[in-house]
Amino acid sequence: LLLHDHGAHFSIGKEKMVRPFGVEASVLADADDWAEKCYDKQYVGDYLASHGYVVLAVDALFWGERGRKEGVRYDSQQALAANMLQMGMSWGALIAWDDIRSAEFLASLPMVHKEKIGTMGFSMGAHRAWMVSAATDVVKAGAAVCWMNTTDSLMTLTNNQNKGGSAYSMIIPGIRNWMDYPHVASIACPKPMLFINGLRDKLFPVKGVESAFSTMQDVWKSQSVENLLTTKFYDLPHFCSKEIQDDILEFFNQNLK
C-alpha cells in the first residue's frame, strides 16, 4: 500500500507513486516532474512492482481525481477541514480511515497474500504509513520516510504544522491530550517498522526526530523486539532518494517475503 505525499501539489495523488498510464500528456508530465523533484526520478510503485510486489495507490481526499471540481486551490484545504469539523469529523482522521479501508481492500485481492501486507510513504505519506500501521493489523510492516518528530519540536513560528492549511490533513483533534506522534506510531509495535529522516530536512528538526526515535526504540525494546524497529538518518533534505528506496525494498524483502 503506497501512500502519496502532500507537497502542496494537488493535481495528482496516486500518480506520485505509480507512473500513470492511459492519461493525458499533461498528467504524465506532471507526474514525471514530481517523481524527479521528490523521488529521484524513480516511481516507488513501479520499482517495487518490478521486484514482484502488488502495489496499490489511491488518491487521498483533495488530491487527483478526488480533488476540487472547481480546480486546485491551496486555501480550500482550510475550508474542507472546517466543514468536516462542523460535521463532527476531521480531514486527517478521514484520510487515516480511508487508508485503513485501502489496506483491507488490498488484502482482499486474490493475487495478494493477506498476511504479507506492507505500507510505505514519503512526507505526508510517511505520516499516513505509520498511522495505518498503528491502526490496523491488516498491515504487517511499514516504512515511513521524512515524517516523524515531537510536538514540542514542531511548535515553532516557522514550522508548517502551525500555519493551518496543509497541516489539517495531518491533525486528528484531541489525540495530543493522550499521546504524541511517536507514541501513536508505537502502537504498531511489535510489527517491523522502518523510519528514515533527513539530516537536512528543514521541516523536521533533527533534535525532535532523535527524541521520537528514542521513544519508539524504548517501546520496541520493552517488548523484546528491538530488532524489528529500524531508525535511520540520511544526509539529505526532504527527499526520497533511490538509495532510500533500495533500503525500503530490502526492508520489505526481509519482513514480507
Regions found by a protein language model. Name each.
Residues 4-97, 107-108, 154-156:
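Cap/lid segment of the alpha/beta-hydrolase catalytic domain
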Residues 83-86, 94, 101, 141-185, ...:
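Mobile cap/lid helix-loop segments that gate and shape the active-site cleft of serine hydrolases
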Residues 111-123:
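Alpha/beta-hydrolase fold nucleophile elbow
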Residues 121-133:
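Glycine-rich nucleophile elbow surrounding the catalytic serine of serine-hydrolase chemistry
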Residues 134-140:
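Conserved hydrolase catalytic core segment
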Residues 188, 195-197:
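Short beta-strand/loop motif that positions the catalytic acidic residue
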Residues 200-204, 208, 238-239:
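Acidic catalytic loop of the alpha/beta-hydrolase fold
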Residues 214-257:
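C-terminal catalytic histidine-bearing segment of alpha/beta-hydrolase fold enzymes
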